[in-house]
């Protein structure tokens, strides 16, 4: 290999090594940053598994013994203190722009609406836990306004807060009573219901600060003991708090839904069945009165539900997703169910009872439940679905500008922001119909966030009067658009293209034009010229003198002069006529001579029959003067036909 080529290859190899070294250093720095970021994670972020959610976003799956699996969005990752003790900004770009994830007050308010995370169980029917082979109510948030509608005959009380039936009522079909635990303390005090004032007195100042927290703790602390075996059960029963009577109920029946003619009756039909049908409902009468919850609401901190759960509706706001610098509200296009709603209350009830809401309702029940009522409560071993809190649990109530109708749009996506809309309301299947305002922002420190310019309209999120406000402004201008500078692209070198050699163009060969065939022209019959007759001059007529010519007088002399003049004119006229006749004779002679010399066309050559029985010798025979041709040929022909005697005799 030449020395110059080896030198070029060596330089190229050296350049490649330098590039690889730079890439290696960059990779080490990236890996180091990743390790440091992992080391900064809080203890709550340990033992996590990354999965893909329904909305195709990465989410962290938290697991523990005390709570079912819940999903935590990656874009709401908790911040950790850096080496300087300051709160670090989130690493996800979308989180940097979303104030509902970056600002502490707004982020804490937004987290409570992540129902799979904060509740983790069914809402319409909550049977998300299993204990000792029994299905157990396990949600971590109270459900406001939830009641159980009984379908007993008209003579029954139809109140699910009545005492549950005992063995004394087993003969009645359907069974009377409700779901309340009828146990009694040895002191004679009823186990349920119990006044909140008594709970507050017994628990003291160290107890929960909220009535719901105290009721939940009462149910959580209950231990069922079988008196015959002294077996202690760890099964936890649900509770209901009545805010009007301020009473706490502990239910002995965990079932919340029973339907179908195979299992239950409605108003006694069909007859003979043990159970009357029942189902969960939210009614306006119970909206502010009843709160249904599991005993696990009190696990850990009995008052945590107050700040951790979506207990109320949000006024003048809609749930949405943060996209491109703005909160895009959920509407009919992103909903799973969207219909007109006449009022807000209707939308609040609809989001709780829609068929896609989070529910742990069984689909089948044991057949033995119709024969022995003790086998029914509360085991449903035939089917035991667990929703984990996932479902269509959110609804937006708003006025649709296009149709002028109020719409209730229900959706199953976890929202991550609120879009401020005057007159709108954001509901959840867990919360009450009570409306609360969005948290306040700081107008002095909040930096407006501008969304993208779409169709010449840009959405700007601002803090006006300590409240979030989204306004639209025109964003299209007419500036000079400077295209991005691109490196010049050299056109590929193409070999010169030689022009194609065209073959010589030959003129088109025209077919020979045949002359038109003219019909034979018969020669005109030439008549022999006739000699013009020359008039002989007449002698002048000499008139005798009239009488008196011999006498004198001027008169006779004048008459003589006139006569002489008239004789001269006559001679001139006669000479002119004679000259014309001579000229005509010459012309006729020339014409006759011309036709004598012209050959006859072969097609017109006279035959023997046409020439009187002889062959014509030449064209001159026609032009021979009649005095020669007629007499000579006539004589010859006469001799050949009749003989000379006949001619002589004829003439």
From Swiss-Prot:
GO terms for cellular component: extracellular region; plasma membrane. Residues 42-570 are extracellular. Proteolytically cleaved within its transmembrane domain, releasing a soluble form from the cell surface. Its main location: membrane. The chain crosses the membrane at residues 571-591. Residues 483-547 have a biased composition (Pro residues). InterPro entries: Apmem_Ag1 (IPR003298). It is a single-pass type I membrane protein. This is Apical membrane antigen 1-like protein. It comes from Toxoplasma gondii (strain ATCC 50861 / VEG). The lineage of its organism: Eukaryota, Sar, Alveolata, Apicomplexa, Conoidasida.
